[in-house]
């Protein structure tokens, strides 16, 4: 039988109540003081409950007053906070990797709610007093112990009463140029789901989450690994709560501290660091420790006001299921909000627009924030559901705890169970290129999962280790294409003939060289470039990289496609054997790229 405790917290007269005080979260200018006193619940007959075998109870209740009104805070231990095979890694001074599997299941991190308030929630650490936050009557309150010798005093305060370390809004570094219009999103959301899609959306999703702490952050906290661990645990407990409305469970599968040095160069340019981190996860981390998503917590100050960056709609992709977050504030709630925001991007969620709302605010996916965020907006929930149905990411369907699986595995139910490597639904519904829908096993390595679109594309092959087809890759620039009529350039195969057909139609082709020799004149109609408004004539070797000339088939004309500024040969166009156009010159293809 699970033991329950009733703890009465009495509001006491405190000499500094309501004045400014320095807490772990920062300077707080208005607060209430309470003194928790544990009172064990009694069994029938007045007999006291026996002490539990574990250090921390599975459930607890706390009664106290907020603004003079009594409330009861119900807490349940977050049993799924750590994955069953959770590990911790740090490095010796000589660079030797040290990995352990510490006993973390008897932990002190809780979720909860205010009794008789349907929409309330709470995130509490009970390791050393009560620390965290709870929602009460639509407002968020924070609680933490006061550092007073031989005292059980705690402070309760609101976010608005904390003096910000920096008034500058925190900014997500994700730049979005592919926002759908409101109209297109609305049309998509109005489509009727099939029963199978509805079941898939309702199934609980699981993300095995790996956190890396870089060397700057390690040194900032005075090389104190236990303190860093507690900070990360509290963050993940908060992140876990924020994703519950989306039916996603976040389980920490690993924590790694770069205690000797960074494993790649962490730079102030967030986009560069994100790319490096994704490559490190793909080539170094995944071969030694499985995970669905990884985040880098860093002590570096990113350029501008950026505090985080992530790829959009990239969950389960080996080099893109990552995000980077700056540990920019002592307040755990702020950094945890950024971690949640960036993981939201990985789950296909864009930044909220002005029309997106959530209660209480601010919304998690706002691009700029100065306060902790606790709720996803209706826009975010809709985009997440659309991402699930569109991309069907496989890695979030397997439960991290094998003990939770009690029913026999069924191939085709979208749930990765014992004996299965993947599950993409029925063969008719499966949209995974590297999962065998009939066997629920990964397709073998070298199985083609994406055909080459043309000469300048490359086919993609399954890895045999994932249900996802690898990221689309291209032929290198300069690779011959279209029967040696051109050379690949940024996915295309530019040729003078194709340029004429595109501009004038299928009855046209490129003109003979005699027409291009006119480009040596450098007049209004024929030139290779411009400098300070003056047209520059072409050198003899560069004439095919200047003004474009086309000829109607079965004629001898030299036509210039109509354009006031002239149509020039496109960059990368073949201008001779082993030669391509670059900035109005015909250069060797080997040196051009």
Curated annotation (Swiss-Prot):
Keywords: Calcium, Complement system impairing toxin, Disulfide bond, Fibrinogenolytic toxin, Glycoprotein, Hemostasis impairing toxin, Hydrolase, Metal-binding, Metalloprotease, Protease, Secreted, Signal, Toxin, Zinc. It is an enzyme of class 3 (hydrolase). Residues 408-477 form the Disintegrin domain. GO terms for molecular function: metal ion binding; metalloendopeptidase activity; toxin activity. A motif (D/ECD-tripeptide) lies at residues 455-457. Zn(2+) binds at residues 341, 345, 351. It is found in: Secreted. Ca(2+) 1 binds at residues 208, 292, 395, 398. Ca(2+) 2 binds at residues 410, 413, 415, 417, 420, 423. SUPFAM superfamilies: Blood coagulation inhibitor (disintegrin), Metalloproteases ('zincins'), catalytic domain. Inhibited by EDTA, EGTA, 1,10-phenanthroline and DTT. Not inhibited by PMSF and SBTI. Disulfide bonds join 316-395, 356-379, 358-363, 422-435, 424-430, 434-440, 449-469, 456-488, 481-493, 500-550, 515-558, 528-538, 545-581, 575-586. Negative results: does not degrade beta- and gamma-chains of fibrinogen. Does not hydrolyze fibrin, azocasein and BAEE. Does not show hemorrhagic activity. Monomer. Belongs to the venom metalloproteinase (M12B) family. P-III subfamily. P-IIIa sub-subfamily. This is Zinc metalloproteinase-disintegrin-like atrase-B. It comes from Naja atra (Chinese cobra).
